Regions:
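Regulatory and interdomain segments flanking nucleotide-handling catalytic cores
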Residues: 1-254
Length: 254
C-alpha cells in the first residue's frame, strides 16, 4: 500500500472521536491541577488556607496561557483551577476540542512546573456555551465555588489549628450551612466577610492598554507608545456585577 493511502486509512482511527466547537458557541476552557493537595500541602508546604505565593503561581500560569497563541480575553483563577474565556472569533485548530485541550494542558503544566521547580500537571476540558447568559452564569458558578471553598477552608484549618484531627474537623463541618460556619469563625475572632477579596472571590486576569513614554531617535523626540499588558485584578466584583464585568471582555478587540 502506498504511504499516502496507508496514512489516510490510519488517520480515520486517530480522528474517529474528534469534536469541533460550532462557530455559534462560546468557548470556555477550565483547567484543574492534578493531585495539587499533595503538592501544596506536603511537598511545598504552602500556608493554609491561603498563600500569596501559590496565588501568584496560579496567576502567572494564567498569564502564560493568555499569551500562548489563542484569543483568550479573560482568565479567572481560584484555588488550583483556571477558567479561560475565548473571543467569539477564536478559530485556532479549527476549534478542535482535542487540540485545544492538549495544548492548554501542556502549556499550563510546563509554565507552573518551571515556576515552582516541581513537576506539576493540569487537566483541561472545553466547555461550549450557547449564549452570553450562560457565559456569565459559568463564571458566577465558579465564583460561588470559590466562596464556598474559602469558607470551608477557613473553618477546617481553624479547627485543625485547635488540635482537631482531619476527620474530626470534617465531621464538625459536615452538612453545616453558611451561618454555622461564619459563626464558628466569629467565635475565633475571624470575620469571614472581611478576609481579602481574592481569597473569597478569586482573581481575574485580562489585557489592558497601557501608554508608555518612549523616544524616537530618528525624529529626536519623545513619543507615546501604546501596548497591551496583562493585569491581575485582586478585587473583582461579586454576583451579578461580576457577570456583567466578565461579559464586557467579549467586546474587546483581539
Amino acid at each position: 500500500m502506498h504511504f499516502d493511502d496507508f496514512d489516510k486509512e490510519m488517520r480515520k482511527y486517530e480522528e474517529s472521536i474528534d469534536q469541533y466547537i460550532p462557530e455559534d458557541k462560546y468557548i470556555v476552557v477550565r483547567l484543574d491541577g492534578r493531585s495539587f493537595t499533595r503538592l501544596t500541602k506536603r511537598v511545598c508546604k504552602f500556608k493554609v488556607p491561603f498563600d500569596e505565593k501559590f496565588r501568584d503561581l496560579m496567576t502567572d500560569t494564567v498569564k502564560s496561557l493568555m499569551e500562548s497563541g489563542f484569543k483568550i480575553v479573560y482568565g479567572y483563577t481560584e484555588s488550583d483551577e483556571i477558567s479561560l474565556l475565548f473571543h467569539p472569533s477564536e478559530d485556532t485548530f479549527s476549534r478542535k476540542v482535542r487540540k485545544i485541550n492538549t495544548t492548554l494542558a501542556g502549556e499550563a503544566s510546563a509554565a507552573f512546573s518551571l515556576n515552582i521547580g516541581q513537576i506539576a500537571t493540569f487537566d483541561s476540558r472545553v466547555v461550549p456555551l450557547p449564549d452570553k447568559k450562560r457565559v456569565g452564569d459559568y463564571f458566577r458558578w465558579r465564583q460561588e465555588d470559590s466562596l464556598r471553598n474559602a469558607l470551608q477552608g477557613y473553618c477546617y484549618w481553624t479547627l485543625r489549628d485547635e488540635g482537631k484531627t482531619a476527620s474530626q474537623a470534617s465531621r464538625i463541618l459536615n452538612r453545616k450551612g453558611v451561618k454555622f460556619k461564619k459563626d464558628l469563625l466569629a467565635e475565633k475572632g475571624i470575620d469571614f466577610d472581611s478576609v481579602p477579596n481574592w481569597q473569597r472571590y478569586g482573581c481575574g486576569i485580562y489585557f489592558k492598554e497601557i501608554e508608555r513614554e518612549g523616544f524616537n531617535p530618528i525624529k529626536n523626540e519623545k513619543v507615546i507608545a501604546k501596548r497591551r499588558e496583562l493585569f491581575v485584578d485582586y478585587e473583582i466584583p461579586y454576583g451579578v456585577e461580576y457577570k456583567d464585568y466578565v461579559l464586557e471582555f467579549l467586546e474587546y478587540d483581539v
